[in-house]
Amino acid sequence: MEKQTLVWAHRGASGYAPENTLEAFQKAVEMGADGVELDVQLTKDGELVVIHDETVDRTSDGSGWVKDFTYARISRFNFNRTHPEGYERAMIHTLEEVYELLKPTGLTINVELKTGVVFYPEIEERVLDLTARMGLEERVWYSSFNHYTVQRIKELNPQAKTGMLYCDGIVNPVSYGALVVGADAMHPALYNLQYPNYMEDCKKHGKRVHVWTVNEEQYMRMVCEMQVDAMITNYPDVGRRIAAEYLDGTLTPELVRVIKKQGKQG
């Protein structure tokens, strides 16, 4: 029996609204996403804020490092830069505020801890404590490119669900993720799926696969055929449509192969 690939909205429905904002997460809910992916960093005064970059330059009208601003100061910036059309102003929000928005929805929440550049002290403890206080332990996945952070989450809470993010080539990545990092899921960049026997290795080690970032329809079809557990995409409405087509038989494996072949020729 075919299983449906879940659709997680990357930084919310970031193809349509300013990334990592309440507007983007609300749109993901409205588009029927199964989950959302978001990024967390710490302000100077210790607030967990939802933002991808270590600086505010790309996504706002401000400039500087997140770690150097208090929450009151960083909140003055306009975070609409990734989608100024239709969004005169967009705010940066705390993780707690995003949790409050998503708690009634039942959506899965993937929290990526951004500890690769700035080594935020005790951010793992802070995120776990907030998740527990909000009663969301069963719905939250924790991921990071910093594999020490992934290990630390497990040390603090062995029941926490963790994903190992990576994009560069790793020798035996699934064995490394399972046996060294101790992650529950692999979070590979899309192109990592081309490694020989990748899905078979994940199944052998009992690891889920949550792949990022899948924005083109031909690759959405490909990951559905591969029965990836979740695709992380900026366009959750498109992902949901294609995942549903694959499950109901509209999108057959034969058709997927034809589409992939046409894509290579184009």
Residue ranges of predicted features:
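Phosphate-group recognition and catalysis centered on beta-loop-alpha active-site segments
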Residues: 1-266
